[in-house]
Swiss-Prot record:
Domain of life, source organism: Bacteria
A Pfam family that the UniProt record links to this protein: SPOUT_MTase
Protein name as catalogued: Ribosomal RNA large subunit methyltransferase H
Lineage: Bacteria, Bacillati, Mycoplasmatota, Mollicutes, Mycoplasmataceae
Subunit relationships: Homodimer.
GO CC, alphabetical: cytoplasm
Keywords: Cytoplasm, Methyltransferase, rRNA processing, S-adenosyl-L-methionine, Transferase
The encoding gene: rlmH
SUPFAM superfamilies from the UniProt entry: alpha/beta knot
Family as reported in the entry's similarity comment: Belongs to the RNA methyltransferase RlmH family.
Residues where S-adenosyl-L-methionine binds: L72, G104, L123, A124, K125, I126, T127, L128
Amino acid sequence: MKIKIICFGKLDKAFYVDAFNDYFKRLKKYVDLEIIELKEEINGELNKIKDENSNLLLKKLENYKDFEKIILDVNSKLISTENLVEIIKTNLNYKTAKILFVIGPSDGYSKSFLNSFTNKFSLAKITLPHQLCRIVLIEQIYRVFKIINNEKYHK
């Protein structure tokens, strides 16, 4: 299975990098995981910034037409680990099992971007820093594969 995570910016604190790398290494035995980091536009009027970042995402997503896309958005439906297990299990049954998660820019997506996708979920009802969101997501993906493979999470 291939999983890609598109996000804005880089992990810039050692503790985030360490946590992320730990889960990344653990996941290698289950999945081909790739992180795609985009440069976020941060200067200008809010709606213009949202449009520019959303357009950048749309252009990047054109390269992944055969992936199931899941947009992470704090205002969308809350997803549970069990929901994520079902999504990944369902995709594992396809020959071309490919999922792409999108962690949006810090100011959010444009309305038109959000309206063009049906798979939108929130990892929490609290606002997470984007770097922490990336770690929570990769940890949940790791947890899902432990569940799918009937393996203990804590050793």
